[in-house]
């Protein structure tokens, strides 16, 4: 009896899998244009917002710290350069002398500032000149964009050789010139080849050859 349990026997053959067909470009295009479900991000929206807020807070703290450091450096520089004035117990003449000294210091600082500004302006001008020279050198060695231009052989030779182009292009100058009269004379001499053969045939023709 045959086994009815659904199992395959020794004589049964397993069907071969269908051949894999390559998708056409149209199918690929259709697949690409079809809307697909977007992959879910591993980070939720609330978590992203929290991280952005934290980054902004850290950046704000860094900016505040840098501003505080600049203010501290400015205060230290002013304390070393501008010492506090001691005005207690000074008379009118002493105050005038102190004012004159302060004015002299201000004038000296202005002169130094003017000298520094002149040096900075000179350096900026020199840098601009050097940059201009660099651009000029780049422009000299820059390869221009070439365009296709239709030009005849005569025009090309004229551009390359100049006045000598006419001599080189005159190809007929070295050829042998044959006059029209010479060709007509040769044609008359040839004439009808049958008559020449008849004239030279027979005894008379042989006689003419010996006589000639």
UniProtKB/Swiss-Prot annotation:
Tell me if Zinc is a UniProt keyword of this record: no
Biological processes, Gene Ontology terms: cardiac muscle contraction; skeletal muscle contraction
The record's region (Disordered) falls at 1-45
Q: Which SUPFAM superfamilies match?
A: Troponin coil-coiled subunits (SSF90250)
Q: In the record, which positions carry N-acetylalanine?
A: 2
Q: Which GO terms describe its molecular function?
A: actin binding; ATP binding; ATPase inhibitor activity; magnesium ion binding; troponin C binding
Q: Which residues carry this modification: Phosphoserine?
A: 5, 24-25, 44, 46, 79, 152, 201
Query: Its GO CC terms?
Result: cardiac myofibril; cardiac Troponin complex; troponin complex
Q: At what positions is Phosphothreonine found?
A: 33, 53, 80, 145, 183
Post-translational events: Phosphorylated at Ser-24 and Ser-25 by PRKD1; phosphorylation reduces myofilament calcium sensitivity. Phosphorylated preferentially at Thr-33. Phosphorylation by STK4/MST1 alters its binding affinity to TNNC1 (cardiac Tn-C) and TNNT2 (cardiac Tn-T). Phosphorylated at Ser-44 and Ser-46 by PRKCE; phosphorylation increases myocardium contractile dysfunction.
Which Cys-Cys disulphide bridges does the record give? Answer: none
This protein's source sits in the domain of life called Eukaryota
Which intervals of the chain are annotated as region Involved in binding TNC and actin? 131-151
Assembly, in brief, is: Interacts with TRIM63. Binds to actin and tropomyosin. Interacts with STK4/MST1.
Q: What is this protein called?
A: Troponin I, cardiac muscle
Q: Gene encoding this chain?
A: TNNI3
């Amino acid at each position: 009896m045959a086994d009815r349990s659904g199992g395959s026997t020794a004589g049964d053959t397993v069907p071969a899998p269908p051949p894999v067909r390559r998708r056409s470009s149209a199918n690929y295009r259709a697949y690409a244009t079809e809307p697909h479900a977007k992959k879910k991000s591993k980070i939720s929206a609330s978590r992203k917002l929290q991280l952005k807020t934290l980054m902004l807070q850290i950046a704000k703290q860094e900016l505040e710290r840098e501003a505080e450091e600049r203010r501290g450096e400015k205060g230290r520089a002013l304390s070393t350069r501008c010492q506090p004035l001691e005005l207690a117990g000074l008379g009118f003449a002493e105050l005038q002398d102190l004012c004159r000294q302060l004015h002299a210091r201000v004038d000296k600082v202005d002169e130094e500032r003017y000298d520094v500004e002149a040096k900075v302006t000179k350096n900026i001008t020199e840098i601009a000149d050097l940059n201009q020279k660099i651009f000029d050198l780049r422009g000299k060695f820059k390869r221009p964009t070439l365009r296709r231009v239709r030009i005849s052989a005569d025009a090309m030779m004229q551009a390359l050789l100049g006045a000598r182009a006419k001599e080189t292009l005159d190809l007929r100058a070295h050829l042998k010139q044959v006059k029209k009269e010479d060709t007509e004379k040769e044609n008359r001499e040839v004439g009808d080849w049958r008559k020449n053969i008849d004239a030279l045939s027979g005894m008379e023709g042989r006689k003419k050859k010996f006589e000639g």
